A protein has these predicted regions:
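Bacterial N-terminal signal peptides
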Residues: 7-16
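Amphipathic/hydrophobic helical signal segments and adjacent flexible N-terminal regions
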Residues: 6-7, 21
Length: 206
């Protein structure tokens, strides 16, 4: 069993680094082994994160709250690529610069974007232009680019935001300093979510 777990972890790590290596300019944000380069948003928060097979898992039981993970490094203009998986009705978020939330929601059964939100929405700001969610238990892929105050997002191969101007924080942000660099922030206080293959390419300042 220990050998199998070790093999799974090694394979997961190899896969995460291979993605970045095959994409010129991209670097891995998560090494597949530990949370080096990341920190808890709240030191006193319940640690709901674990790592298994190169996957970063946030497991939150009903009635509980986890804690958010934030990169130590801050960024300005960049393209970020990642994969995530959620159960039905689970709720999480991926924050650009720690202030602009790309909503993660297990809403596949609804068959359409929620009014003003839903999976892939810029939370509290702009709903996705198309319904691109996959069923619970399937890996979903995202490419998000932020340049200045403009955000472009492709979810599962469909462009759902194209140069959307977002000049304000969208809620639960680390701070309101939208004109300054900020970290990547994985929301962990709402629901169960899994991430893998997080990688980024920093872009020139606008």
């Amino acid at each position: 069993m220990k050998k199998l777990l070790l093999l799974t972890t090694v394979l997961g790590f190899a896969l995460s680094t291979a993605f970045a290596a095959d994409e010129p300019g991209f670097v891995s944000l998560f090494n597949g082994k530990d949370t080096d380069g990341w920190k808890s948003r709240r030191a006193d928060g319940h640690n709901s994160w674990s790592i298994e097979g190169g996957i970063l898992k946030n497991t939150v039981n009903k009635g509980e709250h986890g804690t958010d993970l934030v990169t130590n490094k801050k960024f300005w203009n960049f393209t970020v690529r990642y994969e995530y998986q959620v159960p039905d009705n689970s709720n999480s978020g991926f924050y650009l610069r720690g202030r602009h939330e790309l909503q993660i929601l297990g809403d596949y059964k609804s068959g359409k974007p929620s009014k003003g939100g839903g999976n892939g929405a810029i939370y509290n700001h702009t709903a996705p232009s198309d319904f691109a969610s996959k069923p619970a238990g399937e890996w979903q892929t995202v490419e998000a680019t932020i340049i200045g105050n403009k955000i472009t997002v492709t979810l599962n191969g469909k462009k759902i935001h194209d140069g959307v101007v977002c000049d304000k924080a969208t809620g639960s942000e680390i701070d309101g300093k939208v004109n300054e660099p900020g970290p990547i922030f994985l929301q962990g206080d709402h629901g169960t979510v899994w991430f893998r293959n997080l990688r980024m390419k920093e872009l020139p300042k606008d």
